[in-house]
Design a protein with these regions (language model features):
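A cross-kingdom feature that marks ATP-driven nucleic-acid transaction machinery
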Residues: 2-5, 20-27, 36, 45, ...
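Interdomain hinge/linker elements that couple catalytic modules in large macromolecular machines
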Residues: 3, 164-353
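Hydrophobic anchor at the beta1->P-loop junction of P-loop NTPases
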Residues: 31
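Conserved lysine of the Walker
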Residues: 39
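Conserved catalytic segments around the Walker B and adjacent sensor/switch elements
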Residues: 48-65
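Short glycine-rich substrate-engagement loop in P-loop NTPases that contacts/grips substrate
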Residues: 61-93
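Structural recognition of the conserved hydrophobic beta-strand(s) that form the central parallel beta-sheet
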Residues: 99, 123-129, 150
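Short regulatory helix/loop adjacent to the ATP-binding pocket of P-loop NTPases
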Residues: 115, 132-148, 160-165
Length: 449
């Protein structure tokens, strides 16, 4: 019996609907995201529900005949006729959409979007992963008519929707807006639910496995398969295996609590700066990781003064991060599962909490920046985990994996840059609490920042 594909509600669907209604064929959209993040499922569901008919061309398995159609697009009438015959679908003017799935496999189709959009008969949606990798774009003209949308792993609210819960996150939001505590018992329950999300993650296949089996060992198998797929992709891009090594080392590098990702400690010395920049840029383009850059001058223009050679790397999905951290061990030996499932909070899990906060901020469209500066004696560094712009101010965020409320780095930073500082946040595991200028938020409320 064929397995039924579970389709999860995604927030990007509403943005796509706005595009369809507002642009009326003037642009195409490119839905970009990591492999296995749910791009194809989302766009096909959108096409099925919002159009009279659609043609989906999956370039990862298209025939030579279909691939060849895009080598000469001088006669669009002929192109549309051939597509309708090959896919046995009737296209209706301004009521049908053509989907170019895995468009990076046929760059000429992506280049053709300019002329297809100008023709105006149909809508066009592209999906792609590794879309910006040099080998996928080096010989084509990128169409300016292409609007990019990014699909990330399910965020926490989407995860709750998948579990059939539409009430919790709106209630959390109203509590956050009123800045009132929820009470210890409720906080413990909300935190336990959020820690489940940290373990399962937001990859649709992992969420499906959890819903089907209620078994984290089965979920872990699915996550291992996704990690293997990513590593295979990295080896195709970089035959030396260095990119795969950089990805595998993300948890261990974060766990060192160093002020940056130390590339040389992972792949050894003797690698040129240009090679390192290319490897990290292409890994970032794959959307399997989130990169936080050091802000050399913490203020509103952080993207202008970021240090591209000083950064931290987070896994784009915290569920994958948990599995990656113990990739060489059996599921039963992965202590992160045991510690997060129990109510015993462990200060040593700071790197897991930091990763899920990075994932949450990126899902909300934020760029990641952090800041370090030397102590008065100069023997170690103060560090602000994340910085968010807020109007003409900057908001420092410190992440704690426990109920620990001390935050020396935050205090010194706010004193040093008092004129630039807006809201100050400590994300931790206890209830919402305001003390002086600092707002203590339970980690599950990071989604509202």
């Amino acid at each position: 019996m064929e397995k039924i594909k579970v389709i999860f509600k995604r927030k990007l669907y509403e943005k796509m609907l706005q595009w369809k209604n507002n642009d009326n064929g003037r642009t195409a959209i490119l839905v970009e995201g990591a492999r296995r993040v749910g791009k194809s499922t989302l766009v096909e569901e959108f096409a099925r529900r919002e159009y009279a008919s659609y043609i989906l061309i999956d370039f990862s398995k298209a025939s030579k005949e279909v691939m060849g159609l895009f080598e000469d697009i001088s006669d669009l009438d002929y192109l549309f006729l051939r597509l309708q015959l090959l896919f046995n679908v009737k296209l209706h003017e301004r009521k049908s959409v053509i989907i170019f799935d895995e468009v990076q496999k046929q760059p000429l189709a992506r280049q053709a979007v300019k002329h297809l959009v100008a023709d105006g008969r149909y809508d066009y949606i592209e999906t792609g992963s590794l879309i910006s990798i040099r080998k996928n774009v080096k010989d084509i003209i990128i169409p300016s008519e292409e609007r990019k949308f990014y699909l990330h792993p399910l965020d926490y609210e989407e995860f709750r929707w998948a579990l059939g819960d539409t009430a919790t996150v709106p209630l959390m939001r109203s509590v956050f807006e009123r800045k009132t505590p929820v009470g210890d018992a409720v906080n413990r329950k909300l935190l336990r639910d959020f820690r489940l999300y940290m373990l399962v993650g937001g990859m649709p296949q992992a969420v499906s496995a959890y819903l089907e089996t209620n078994n984290l060992a089965e979920v872990d198998i699915v996550k291992r398969d996704i990690i293997t797929l990513y590593e295979d992709d990295f080896r195709k891009i970089d035959g030396s295996g260095r990119m795969s090594m950089l990805y595998d080392a993300v948890p261990s590098e974060l766990n060192k609590k160093a002020s940056r990702y130390q590339v040389s400690s992972v792949i050894g010395g003797g690698v040129s700066k240009a090679t390192i920049e290319q490897l990290t840029a292409e890994m970032k383009d794959s959307m399997t990781v989130n990169v936080a850059y050091h802000a050399n001058d913490p203020g509103v223009g952080m993207s202008l003064n970021r240090d591209i050679n000083r950064y931290k790397i987070y896994a784009a999905d915290t569920g994958l991060f948990v599995t990656l951290a113990f990739k060489d061990k059996d599921f039963m030996e992965n202590v992160i599962y045991q510690k997060l499932l129990s109510d015993k909070l462990d200060a040593n899990l700071g790197f897991v909490y930091e990763n899920v906060i990075a994932q949450t901020l990126v899902a909300n469209g934020k760029s990641l920046f952090y800041y370090t500066f030397p102590t008065e004696k100069g023997n170690h560094l103060y560090e602000i985990d994340f910085l968010l712009p807020q109007g003409n101010k900057v908001c420092p965020i410190e992440v704690k994996s426990s109920a620990y409320k001390r935050h020396v780095s935050l205090d010194v930073f706010c004193s040093k840059y008092s004129s630039r500082v807006g809201s100050r946040y400590v994300l931790y595991t206890k209830d919402l609490h305001k003390e002086g200028n600092v707002l203590y938020l339970p980690v599950y409320m990071a989604q509202f920042l």
